[in-house]
Amino acid sequence: MKLSRTVSYAVRATLQLAQNGSSAPVPCSKLASEGEMPERFLLQILRVLETHGILKSTRGVEGGYSLSRSPEDISLLEVIEAIDGPLETGGEAPPAEQPADVQQLLQTALRQVTDTARKQLESIKLSQLLPPPPLTPTLPPAVPTEKDAVEI
């Protein structure tokens, strides 16, 4: 499955917001520069995501965009369909030399593929696409050396 550039930017921006970890709004300019995306184009995408209830915006000096729900509650399908519209089989099969029953079987098969893809994309949440948090090394307790010993 190939994602459009617009969907790719939408996913990238929502993941940046999810990775931010706070509910503080992030300016579009920061998302654009950190994600290496064109700011004006990204702004249009963010507005669409806001319209679909995926993001919320805050105006003002400290304004920007944030996720409207937790990353565990936003599916990849929601982001894709907010930008590209409903995932579909691609329309009717072109008229061909094939008998009508073959065309019907093909449409049924394509519909099943689309339904499976929709279910898979719905099951993938933004939280699952985030990189794991960095491991913080745990050091063993310090072992006293002769230098540390105090004579009594």
Report each predicted region and the residues it spans.
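Beta-hairpin "wing" of winged helix-turn-helix
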Residues: 53-67
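Conserved segment of winged-helix/HTH DNA-binding domains
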Residues: 71-95, 110, 114-115
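C-terminal regulatory/oligomerization modules of transcriptional regulators
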Residues: 96-152
